[in-house]
Design a protein with these regions (language model features):
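Glycine-rich anion-binding loop/nest that anchors nucleotide
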Residues: 74-90, 104-110
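Feature captures the catalytic ectodomains and active-site-proximal regions of enzymes
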Residues: 3, 8, 17, 100-108, ...
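Generic beta-sheet signal
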Residues: 42, 105-107, 135
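Structural recognition of alpha->loop->beta junctions
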Residues: 26-38, 113-138
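Active-site alpha/beta core segments
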Residues: 1-76
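Gly/Ala-rich phosphate-binding loop of Rossmann-like dinucleotide-binding domains
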Residues: 96
Length: 138
């Protein structure tokens, strides 16, 4: 993948994906959203990408998710999704740094695994004290 240097550092230029307003960005039709109180949208700032659900890629702009969870007394998070080595890992690491207990459910994730990125992500998450398991364990 190509990269670009932005104000906040090097950014990977991913192929277009999860474009707002397309099926690729839509929540699954079988997902029950009647009780959803918050949807965090990320990666929509033109000049700043976003891997984490907690902090934009500039590492300075919070999404508000940590405060939202704290206000509701939530202390433990389960991370799932795409891609394990980027969005899931960054979100899990930022959640851990914000003081949450975090578990990544491995069989509910999928990685890109480019240039050893998956091994590095698991190593970083392990070093941060993030639990790793499969869905049957939770």
């Amino acid at each position: 993948f190509a990269t670009a240097t932005l104000d906040y550092g090097t950014q990977v230029l991913w192929p277009d994906h999860c474009v707002q307003g397309t099926d690729g960005a839509a929540l699954h039709r079988d997902l029950t959203l009647a009780h959803a109180q918050l949807v965090i949208r990320k990666g929509y700032h033109r000049h700043c990408d976003s891997y984490s659900a907690f902090v934009e890629a500039d590492r300075n702009t919070p999404t508000g998710l940590a405060g939202y969870l704290r206000e509701r007394g939530i202390e433990r998070l389960f991370a799932v999704g795409l891609a394990t080595d980027f969005c899931v890992a960054w979100s899990a690491l930022d959640a851990r740094q914000a003081g949450f207990a975090v578990a990544v459910i491995e069989d509910a994730c999928r990685a890109i695994d480019t240039g050893g990125s998956l091994a590095k992500a698991w190593s970083d998450m392990n070093a941060a004290g993030i639990q790793r398991g499969i869905s049957a364990e939770f």
